Amino acid sequence: MVKIRLRRTGKTKQPSYRIVVADSRSPRDGKFIETIGYYLPTRQPKVLEIKADRARYWLGVGAQPTEVVVKLLKRVNVLDEQGKVIAEA
């Protein structure tokens, strides 16, 4: 199964995350298929950048986002409140 999840990068106590598409069997920071964005929670304000078209593509072909990624995708208007993909405007 393909998942959209966070891949931790950065230094100790200074996390940054890449939003990646990966096989669910691979380790958290292991092999991945594609990077579709990044999230910097330690910056003020928090920085979130997602390639919406690629996220919609992967969701369309059946990739399952993790709970945290669902919240991030809702924040950038890729998913609606029910978790359905919003068509491009």
From Swiss-Prot:
A GO CC term attached to the entry: cytoplasm
InterPro entries, sorted: Ribosomal_bS16 (IPR000307), Ribosomal_bS16_dom_sf (IPR023803)
This protein's UniProt keywords: Ribonucleoprotein, Ribosomal protein
GO biological process, alphabetically ordered: translation
Paired cysteines (S-S): none
MF (Gene Ontology): structural constituent of ribosome
Family: Belongs to the bacterial ribosomal protein bS16 family.
Protein name listed in UniProt: Small ribosomal subunit protein bS16
